[in-house]
Curated annotation (Swiss-Prot):
An example molecular function term from Gene Ontology annotations: 4-hydroxy-3-methylbut-2-enyl diphosphate reductase activity
Protein name: 4-hydroxy-3-methylbut-2-enyl diphosphate reductase
InterPro entries according to UniProt: LytB/IspH (IPR003451)
PANTHER family, alphabetized: 4-HYDROXY-3-METHYLBUT-2-ENYL DIPHOSPHATE REDUCTASE (PTHR30426:SF0)
Reactions performed catalytically: isopentenyl diphosphate + 2 oxidized [2Fe-2S]-[ferredoxin] + H2O = (2E)-4-hydroxy-3-methylbut-2-enyl diphosphate + 2 reduced [2Fe-2S]-[ferredoxin] + 2 H(+); dimethylallyl diphosphate + 2 oxidized [2Fe-2S]-[ferredoxin] + H2O = (2E)-4-hydroxy-3-methylbut-2-enyl diphosphate + 2 reduced [2Fe-2S]-[ferredoxin] + 2 H(+)
Residues the entry annotates as binding isopentenyl diphosphate: H41, H74, H124, S222, S223, N224, S266
C-alpha cells in the first residue's frame, strides 16, 4: 500500500505568526495571557497553549480590566476592539495579514457608498469579524441560491469579497452567478482567498486522481480543513477529516492501493507525522511526497511583541 503526501500542507505563515505571538507573550509577561477565540482552529494547538498559561475567551467582558488580550488569526470586529479599549486592555493583534487586507477593503468600499457582498460561512468567526467593519451595508452570501435571493438594483454600487479560507470551486460558482446577475459588481484586482488555502487545495488536486482514499488531518472547526476534504469528495474520492492518528479507522484501508494525506493550515506537522506512522503500522510500505509548490511566506510578529523583545534584549 502506497501513501502520497501532499505538499504544501499544515501550518501557513498566518497560523505560525499567531501561535508564536501567544508563546512569546507568555514568555515575556507570564501567565495569564488572554486570547479572544481559539488562536487557530486546532484543539491540539489550543490545548498546548492552555497548559502554558493561555486563557481562551469569547466575551471580552471575561477579561480582567487592564489585562493583555490577543486577537486570534481570524480577526475581530471594530466593536470588539472598542469593548477592549473600554476595559483598558492591552491589545495584541495576531490577525492574519491576509484577513486584515479583507477588513480594510470592506471598510474602504463601504465608506465610498458601496453595498458589500461578503462571500463566506455565516457563523465563521472570520466572517463575523469582517462583517463587523460595515454591518449596515454588508450582506453575507454562502451559496448560489443566496445570490438568487439578492435584491440590489442596477443603480446600487456593489462590491464583493470572500472569506480567505473558502473552496476555490465554490467561490467560482458563486462569483460567476453574482457577475451574471450584477455585471457592474466590483471586487479586488486579486483574489482574497489566501495563498495557503489555494496552495493546499491545488496540491491536493495533484494527488486525488492517483488515490482511492484521502485523509485530511485537521480540526472539524477548521474551515480550510473542511474545504480540503470536500475538494477530494467532490472528485468522487472516499475522504475523511481526522483530528489525529487516533481517528484513523483500519477498515478504511481495506482494499485500498494508494492513500493520499494532507493537512489543514492550522494542523501541526507533528500530528501529521503520527498519522503517517499509524498508516505504516496499518500496512503502508511506500511513502512519497508530491510537491505542488514551495512556500516561503513569513509574517512579522505584532509590534507589541517585537518592541517588548527589543526592550528586553
Amino acid at each position: 500500500m502506497k501513501l502520497l503526501l501532499s505538499k504544501p500542507r499544515g501550518f501557513c505563515a498566518g497560523v505560525e505568526r499567531a501561535i508564536e505571538t501567544v508563546e512569546k507573550a507568555l514568555l515575556l509577561w507570564g501567565s495569564p495571557i488572554y486570547v479572544k477565540h481559539e488562536i487557530v482552529h486546532n484543539r491540539h494547538v489550543v490545548q498546548g497553549l492552555k497548559t502554558k498559561g493561555a486563557i481562551f475567551i469569547e466575551d471580552v467582558e471575561d477579561v480582567p480590566v487592564g489585562a493583555r488580550l490577543i486577537y486570534s488569526a481570524h480577526g475581530v470586529s471594530p466593536a470588539v476592539r472598542e469593548q477592549a479599549k473600554k476595559r483598558q486592555l492591552i491589545e495584541i493583534d495576531a490577525t492574519c495579514g491576509l484577513v486584515t487586507r479583507v477588513h480594510s477593503a470592506v471598510k474602504r468600499y463601504a465608506l465610498q457608498g458601496y453595498q458589500i457582498i461578503l462571500i463566506g460561512h455565516h457563523n465563521h468567526v472570520e466572517i463575523i469579524g469582517t462583517a463587523g467593519e460595515a454591518p449596515d451595508v454588508t450582506t453575507i452570501v454562502e451559496s448560489v441560491e443566496d445570490v438568487k435571493n439578492l435584491n440590489f438594483s442596477s443603480q446600487d454600487k456593489l462590491f464583493y469579497i470572500t472569506q480567505t479560507t473558502l473552496s476555490l470551486d465554490d467561490v467560482k460558482e458563486i462569483t460567476q452567478a453574482l457577475i451574471v446577475k450584477y455585471p457592474h459588481v466590483e471586487t479586488l484586482p486579486s483574489s482574497s482567498i489566501c495563498y495557503a488555502t489555494t496552495n493546499r487545495q491545488m496540491a491536493l488536486r495533484e494527488i486525488t486522481d492517483l488515490t482511492d482514499l484521502v485523509l485530511v488531518v485537521g480540526d472539524p472547526q477548521s474551515s480550510n480543513s473542511n474545504r480540503l476534504r470536500e475538494a477530494a469528495s467532490t472528485r468522487g474520492i472516499e475522504s475523511y477529516l481526522i483530528n489525529d492518528e487516533k481517528e484513523i479507522h483500519p477498515e478504511w484501508l481495506l482494499g485500498k492501493q494508494v492513500i493520499g494525506l494532507t493537512a489543514g493550515a492550522s494542523t501541526p506537522e507533528e500530528i501529521v507525522q503520527k498519522c503517517i506512522q499509524c498508516l505504516i503500522e496499518l500496512g503502508v510500505n511506500e511513502v512519497e511526497d508530491i510537491v505542488y509548490t514551495h512556500e516561503d511566506v513569513v509574517f512579522q510578529l505584532p509590534k507589541p511583541i517585537v518592541n517588548a523583545r527589543f526592550s528586553v534584549d
